[in-house]
């Protein structure tokens, strides 16, 4: 594929470098760049030391990137040095931007006015001390374009070869600034050589990665123009994400590849537009009322269902019934059934789902009971054994159902997370067939 404009990302912060805080900015910025057709050369992470930050900038410049994007290090404290380092790297002086200083002062006033505990800080003398402490954030490289702050930290865009976009660390501040930053003349000039790509994502569940690899090898020979498609795959908790980038002239090749995947793996290919299973389930539950009954997942499925805005329209409620007594008292599971089959069994999962439908007057229910480990497994039911029951039908009436047992790999956290994913897909399939 032709070489496009290239960019590098520098994520700063000792807390990110040491793993205390997970980097959310690098992947997010990378996606935005790829959407624009900009090639991503490197993502680097470094601590707060100025010479380490400058070393990353010089490394990326030596790699010939057209644009560098940094995140973090824009606060008022002594270890927030990114702007100063970028100014030195770009050969520009730091100057006080009076307009930015006034904007920061107004933001501080509003923040303090909303917090009664620090009303005394509005005293003129006290406030001026605070304003002086934040003046550092109004120091910008000469000739840079300033981005209005979302918090108190403004971003800056410094023209040059490479151009540098400097953004704050908190994602809630960085993300709203991105559109303005990338539309600045300096940024647009830097990425002027980008290639226009289309990017598509397919999602599959229940297909081994080796199965997809075999189909892609077949496509290499069967699909004209396959070599013009840039394909990356990622396996996440039993789901495969396949992202394909291509120039518009290769649209026919992508369409033929998608048809081949649909023909060979139609049962596993559940999304051709990148929608997640959670999005699809939310749409399928419109006009319904769902309840959950969970043991080993301890409410994770209910949390996942209610993570979508508007979920109160269809989620009735859920029960976490860890003990056998709770299963009997809260869900009406017959203790004799548990005694005969064990708490981790398909009959108990069915009874839990039926109990949830009845208790919440729901027409849809999902039950999960299993052994997440690390203890509790037996030869007959090892760690990772999980029973599911999904039911669709009015409470008290015979329901359409899908009840099954699966052996899921991984540690306790993996098994619990995979269990919710399996449950979501069983729910999706049953509702799709409704």
Swiss-Prot record:
SUPFAM superfamilies with a match to the protein in the record: CinA-like (SSF142433), Molybdenum cofactor biosynthesis proteins (SSF53218)
SMART domains (alphabetical): MoCF_biosynth (SM00852)
Family designation: Belongs to the CinA family.
NCBIfam families according to UniProt: cinA_nterm (TIGR00200), PncC_domain (TIGR00199), PRK00549.1 (NF001813)
HAMAP family documented for this protein: CinA_B
Xref: PANTHER family: NICOTINAMIDE-NUCLEOTIDE AMIDOHYDROLASE PNCC, NMN AMIDOHYDROLASE-LIKE PROTEIN YFAY
Protein name: CinA-like protein
């Amino acid at each position: 594929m032709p070489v496009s404009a290239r960019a590098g990302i520098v994520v700063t912060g000792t807390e990110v470098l040491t793993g205390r805080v997970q980097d959310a900015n690098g992947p997010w910025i990378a996606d935005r760049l790829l959407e624009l057709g900009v090639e991503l050369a490197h993502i680097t992470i470094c601590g707060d030391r100025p010479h380490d930050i400058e070393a990353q900038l010089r490394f990326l410049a030596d790699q010939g990137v057209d644009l560098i994007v940094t995140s973090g290090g824009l606060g008022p404290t002594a270890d927030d040095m990114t702007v100063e380092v970028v100014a030195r790297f770009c050969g520009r002086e730091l100057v006080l931007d009076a307009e930015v200083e006034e904007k920061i002062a107004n933001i501080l006033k509003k923040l303090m006015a909303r917090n009664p505990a620090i009303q005394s800080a509005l005293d003129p003398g006290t406030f001026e001390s605070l304003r002086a402490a934040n003046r550092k954030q109004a120091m910008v490289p000469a000739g840079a374009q300033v981005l209005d702050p979302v918090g108190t930290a403004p971003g800056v865009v410094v023209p040059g070869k490479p151009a540098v976009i400097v953004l704050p660390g908190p994602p809630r501040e960085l993300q709203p600034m991105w559109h303005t930053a990338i539309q600045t003349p300096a940024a647009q000039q830097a990425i002027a050589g980008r290639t226009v790509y289309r990017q598509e994502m397919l999602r599959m569940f229940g297909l081994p990665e080796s199965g997809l690899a075999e189909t892609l090898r077949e496509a290499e020979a069967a699909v004209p123009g396959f070599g013009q498609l840039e394909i990356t795959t990622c396996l996440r908790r039993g789901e495969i994400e396949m992202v394909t980038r291509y120039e518009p002239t290769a649209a026919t090749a992508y369409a033929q590849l998608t048809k081949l995947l649909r023909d060979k793996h139609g049962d596993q290919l559940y999304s051709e537009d990148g929608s997640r299973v959670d999005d699809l389930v939310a749409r399928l539950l419109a006009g319904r009322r769902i309840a959950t009954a969970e043991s080993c997942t301890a409410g994770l499925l209910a949390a996942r269902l209610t993570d979508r805005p508007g979920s109160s329209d269809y989620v009735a409620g859920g029960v976490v019934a860890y003990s056998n007594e709770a299963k009997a008292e809260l869900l009406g599971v017959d203790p004799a059934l548990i005694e005969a089959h064990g708490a981790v069994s398909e009959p108990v999962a069915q009874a839990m789902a039926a109990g949830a439908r009845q208790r919440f007057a729901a027409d849809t229910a999902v039950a999960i009971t299993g052994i997440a480990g690390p203890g509790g497994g037996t030869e007959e039911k090892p760690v990772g054994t999980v029973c599911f029951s999904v039911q669709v039908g009015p409470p008290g009436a015979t329901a359409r159902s899908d009840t099954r047992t699966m052996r899921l790999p991984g540690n306790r956290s993996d098994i619990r997370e995979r269990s919710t994913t399996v449950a979501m897909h069983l729910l999706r399939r049953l509702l799709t067939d409704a």
